[in-house]
Amino acid sequence: MRLEITSKGMDLTPAIKNSIEKALQKSLKITKSLSSEEHFKVFVEKTNSPEEPFLAKIVTHIFKKDLVVTKSGKDLYAVLDLISDDLARHLRKEKEKHYV
């Protein structure tokens, strides 16, 4: 798995990196059967919004198109959990379209 992590407005700590890798494990199980090389680009950002100060975005390429999932919220770790669930759901949907 190739993983590119970019942050804006915050330090990328080892705990955040581990949380991102853990969050992508669910999606990795789905993509292993679809592609020989998984490539995920993850962007995390601390915004100026008091309601939703954290933004996370995951981009991956599957079935000749880019799949982009974006979430925001008050807690970065909760946002990472939400975005990983959303990404897994979208990947399953794409897999069913092409293999069922």
Question: What do these predicted ranges mean?
Answer:
Residues 1-100:
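N-terminal, polar/charged subdomain of small-to-medium soluble alpha/beta proteins
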